[in-house]
């Protein structure tokens, strides 16, 4: 099973991790946090899942990665980064290489193969062999303007043109790709209750974001302090998520709190909605320190 294979890779490389079947399947942490969605067919990953994964990753400063075996049309090749709704998408072997510090140099995007080259290295190598920008452009089959732009800043270049440049200049120019994603649009609270809780936390000085397909649905941040929270009127819904919230909090080293309308006994700090209006941010911090 693919999920087990990925967890084995994580264990062998010293990661602590937990599972949740939502916008991510594995939250893993060593020096930093990775949020992994694991699917045999990566085309089954939906845009709503991607938006929630982006929001969660932005707030946690985590790396979101979609790991799979194939699309509907082809198998995923190793050492190539694919793209699905702006989430870096890789094969299991590529993930293992990334964990070992070996980042791919090829991006598959919208049917094309792209790379990035080092601008300073390109200019230096061109000058070392005595070629003008026009000379190099002619040999590679691109425009002089394109050579100028690639010497000025990092830009995507068609992979085959990057290979031609390296062959012409007899040096390595391609650089490892960063695991980038686009920023997520704000996700609105889905209920009046969630909106009221968010309003109370904002009054205390917290910035709040909502995220779904996750064991919790609200993230609250104040300066360098951050907490994850499951906010729901019904405690039976929260009780289903408690083990996942606890594990996620332990793995990511983020404080967790539960907010509901009813009394609930659990291993996570809890607050009732009617307690919030009289609280300040320092009260929240004190509550979390006691746990």
Go through the PLM ranges and name each one.
Residues 104-127:
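A short, Lys/Arg-rich alpha-helix, primarily the initiator
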Residues 122, 136-137, 147-150:
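Conserved hydrophobic/aromatic packing and binding residues within compact polymer-binding modules
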Residues 130-145:
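Short alpha-helical DNA-recognition segment
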């Amino acid at each position: 099973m693919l999920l087990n294979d990925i967890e084995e890779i994580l264990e062998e490389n010293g990661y602590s991790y937990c599972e949740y079947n939502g916008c991510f399947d594995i939250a893993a942490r060593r020096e930093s946090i990775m949020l992994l969605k694991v699917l045999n067919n990566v085309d089954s990953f939906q845009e709503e899942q991607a938006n929630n994964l982006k929001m969660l990753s932005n707030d946690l400063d985590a790396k979101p990665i979609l790991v799979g075996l194939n699309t509907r049309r082809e198998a995923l090749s190793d050492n190539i980064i694919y793209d699905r709704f702006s989430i870096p998408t890789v094969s299991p072997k590529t993930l293992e290489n990334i964990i070992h510090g070996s980042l791919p140099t090829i991006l598959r995007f919208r049917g094309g193969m792209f790379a990035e080259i080092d601008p300073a290295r390109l200019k230096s190598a061109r000058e070392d062999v005595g070629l003008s920008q026009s000379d190099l452009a002619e040999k590679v089959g691109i425009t002089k303007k394109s050579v100028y732009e690639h010497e000025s800043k990092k830009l995507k270049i068609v992979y085959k043109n990057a290979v031609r440049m390296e062959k012409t200049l007899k040096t390595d120019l391609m650089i490892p790709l960063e695991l980038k994603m686009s920023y997520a649009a704000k996700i609105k609270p889905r209920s009046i209750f969630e909106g009221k809780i968010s309003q109370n936390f904002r009054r205390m000085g917290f910035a709040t974001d909502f995220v779904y397909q996750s064991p919790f649905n609200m993230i609250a941040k104040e300066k360098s302090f951050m907490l994850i929270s499951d906010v729901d009127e019904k405690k039976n819904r929260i009780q289903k998520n408690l083990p996942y919230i606890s594990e996620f909090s332990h793995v990511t080293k983020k404080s967790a709190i539960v907010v509901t309308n009813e009394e609930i006994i659990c291993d996570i700090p809890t607050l009732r909605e009617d307690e919030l209006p009289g609280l300040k941010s320092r009260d929240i911090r004190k509550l979390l320190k006691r746990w």
